Amino acid sequence: MEELFSIDQLDLERLLKEWRWLCPQPVTLLARNGFGDLFLRTAEGKVLWLDVGGGTLSEVADSESVFRDLLKHAPQRELWLAEAVLEAGARHGLKPNNVQCIGFKIPIVFAESAAVPDNAYVADLYEQVSFLGDLHRQIADTPDGGKVRLRIGAPPARR
């Protein structure tokens, strides 16, 4: 399987810094998609999908070999890699490189994002993944449709 984005030069700890509230266990990076989602292998060999847009971490395969086999099937590739959406973005000039991803001015976790024209842009991968980790940490306990108040800046000091 040919990877869409090289992961060789990525700093996993930097990518996961704002996600350790959701993913505290030691993991290695297997792959990523064009939206900054990360596919991680646990010490036990299971494969996890960190969906940075949705703010979820889910087990998707019992092993790396099962994960790679699943990626040979178009429906699974579309679910995890969103290749058709990436191709559509590329036709509109959105072509992230290996340290970039497609981000959204209003994150897709907010219903309002669907109404924003030209919401997508090419973002720095580290900044986007970090921002979304902090965002999802702040709204993790908010019910769907609930009101949120976001804090931009350093997190409050822990006591």
Residue map of PLM features:
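Compact, glycine/acidic-enriched structural inserts
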Residues: L50-E87
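Mixed-charge (acidic/basic) macromolecular-recognition segments
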Residues: R77-V129
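A surface-exposed partner-binding patch
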Residues: M1-W49, I106-R159
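Short, highly charged low-complexity linear segments
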Residues: K46, D69-P75, A90-F104, D144-A154
